[in-house]
Amino acid sequence: MIDLKKSQMWLDRVAYDMDTAKAMLQTGRLIYAVFMCQQSLEKCFKGLLAYQDKEIIPIHNLRRLAELSNVIQKLDEPMLMKLDFLSNYYINARYKEDLQQLSKGITEAVAQDFIQFSEGLITWLCQKMK
């Protein structure tokens, strides 16, 4: 049976995390903007899994979550590459020694692109829950 409360709980967190991603972009904390995009998408996929009445397993890989929620076949290769890129920022972004290495390729434009990508995918995923 579909548990709309559980699904909505995840989606409420998505909005908060996307707002945080935008705030991090504005303050120049670009790696954290990207990290929050990963968090937003992870929670959105888990919200979709809850909506589909599927088990929510404790994983953070966005491609795997797309598979589990049966939407991966609708995502093109560039989208999957972005999911893979964002998945790298889950735990690594939290460890100081990795921050410098991970930050190298993150410019303001890159962070903005991931925010736009995440917002678009979140909108699309949310439409699957109507």
Locations of the language-model features?
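Terminal alpha-helical segments
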Residues: M1-K130
